[in-house]
Regions:
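Catalytic alpha-helical scaffold of carbohydrate-active enzymes acting on polysaccharides/glycoconjugates
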Residues: 3-4, 13, 19, 23, ...
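Active-site-proximal beta-strand elements of phosphoester/diester hydrolases
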Residues: 10-16, 141-149, 185-187, 237-240, ...
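Active-site neighborhood of phospho(di)ester-bond hydrolases with catalytic His/Asp-centered motifs
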Residues: 13-15, 50-55, 87-95, 118-123, ...
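Active-site environment of divalent metal-dependent phosphoester hydrolases
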Residues: 19-22, 58-61, 95-109, 126-131, ...
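Binuclear metal-dependent hydrolase catalytic cores centered on His/Asp/Glu-rich metal-binding motifs
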Residues: 22-38, 72-73, 136-184, 204, ...
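Active-site-proximal segments of metal-dependent phosphoesterases and phosphodiesterases across multiple
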Residues: 61-83, 183-215
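Conserved beta-sheet core of the metallophosphoesterase superfamily
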Residues: 86-89, 200-261
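A short C-terminal boundary segment appended to hydrolase-like catalytic domains
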Residues: 254-255, 259-387
Length: 387
């Protein structure tokens, strides 16, 4: 068969796919039906390629790096859960691939190679990490460009890690990839957790990817379903939720993680159709949503998608969201020591307001906003953290 016969290539794209204590045995035995259910497994079995974000190093050693945030890992035996979803492609451009250092990522890459599992998005250096993945079948070529925001795991010219999003390189990389493919899909690992809309800057980045030739841009990492924007010649999905990531850390975020989206892509030489398949979290993994559940999920999704058609809404919603988070960021400037916490309690949790005034807020804004101060401040902090 060749493309002239009208072949339709079908892909399913899921987001974060992580074994945890509750379902680890199912991964190790490759019992994928117990993880995803019979109906969902049927969809994957009919797919030309199943794409997921491998949000965890697969390693038996414990070599955690210094970072702010959780160091995830999963035993190498859990590889069988992924292998059971062949044909599979795993993306590694995320904020956890280097959680257990060079050792953990090296073990992961070697394990994927041993089990003949396609992957991209991380490597020995940025040159290796930025290499796209091209999937071709029946004359249809789809290129995947994978990148992650800077959060302790990105590669450099000389160090191992994930492909970093870079405003000087990433858009040009997508433009070059499009010249060799029929279609380009960008998987951008970024955006703020548990926020269902794009920030103004994230929206600009994603639109720029489309301007450079991307047919589909999916923002992963937010752990919740966001909103969709059909922009220019492409589609942007600002958050699709987890695929399987049954973490106790989500105990206070059940409303966000209860449902997710699979993104279905049906491509021919002449068309590229994108649709959403709602799924629901279960105790052990995930399953296809019922008709009523799917209606509930998609109705809310479509409402949010209507909201972001208004540029003012995108700006105002993000301003309001920032108001709920800024104190958390500022607390780091006064420290976490027991003495500080005790004094803060003594002053009715208002120590920050007493220590930081208008001048301090303006200075912090300048240090973060001005390119020269931002670069110098960040370099200095990194130097301190390496001592």
């Amino acid at each position: 068969m060749n493309w002239e016969s009208g072949y339709t290539l079908k892909l399913y794209i899921g987001a974060d796919f992580v074994p945890t204590d509750i379902n680890r045995e199912l991964f190790e035995t490759g019992n994928v039906e117990a993880l995803v259910g019979k109906e969902l497994l049927g969809l994957f079995n009919q797919s030309d390629l199943n794409v997921f974000n491998l949000e965890v190093p697969l390693t038996d050693a414990s070599t955690p790096i210094d970072k702010f945030g959780n160091n995830l890992k999963s035993p190498t035996k859990t590889i069988y859960g992924y292998k059971a979803l062949e044909p599979i492609f795993l993306t590694l451009a995320n904020n956890h691939c280097l959680d257990h250092g060079v050792e953990g990522l090296t073990t992961t890459l070697e394990l994927l190679k041993k089990h003949d599992i396609k992957n991209a998005g991380a490597g020995a250096n940025v040159k290796e990490a930025k290499k796209p993945f091209i999937f071709e079948k029946e004359g249809i070529r789809i290129g995947f460009y994978l990148c992650a925001e800077h959060e302790f795991t990105v590669a450099s010219c000389h160090t191992m890690g994930a492909n970093p999003f870079d405003v000087l390189d990433s858009f040009d990389d997508v433009e070059a990839l499009k010249k060799t493919c029929d279609y380009v899909i960008v998987l951008y690992h970024g955006g703020k957790e548990f926020y269902r809309y794009p920030s103004p800057m994230l929206q600009r980045y994603c639109r720029k990817f489309v301007d450079k030739g991307a047919n589909l841009v999916i923002c992963q990492h937010s752990h919740c379903i966001g909103s969709r924007e059909d922009y220019g010649e492409g589609t942007i999905i600002y958050g699709q939720g987890n695929f399987i990531f049954n973490s106790e850390s989500y105990i206070n975020h059940k409303e966000f993680v209860k449902d997710s989206l699979l993104i279905r892509v049906e491509a021919t030489k002449d068309s590229f159709i994108i649709s959403e398949v709602p799924i629901r979290s279960t105790e052990m993994g995930t399953r296809l949503a019922t008709e009523s559940e799917a209606d509930e999920t998609l109705t809310a999704y479509k409402q949010r998608s209507e909201h972001i058609r208004d540029a003012h809404f995108v700006v105002q919603a993000y301003k309001d969201f920032a108001d709920t988070h800024v104190k958390r960021y500022l607390r780091e400037f006064i420290g976490r020591s027991f003495i500080i916490r005790a004094i803060n309690a003594l002053f009715g949790r208002k120590l920050m307001q007493l220590l930081l005034g208008k001048t301090s807020y303006l200075a912090i804004q300048n240090y973060l906003e001005c390119e020269a101060h931002h670069e110098l401040f960040l370099r200095g902090i990194k130097n301190i953290n390496k001592k």
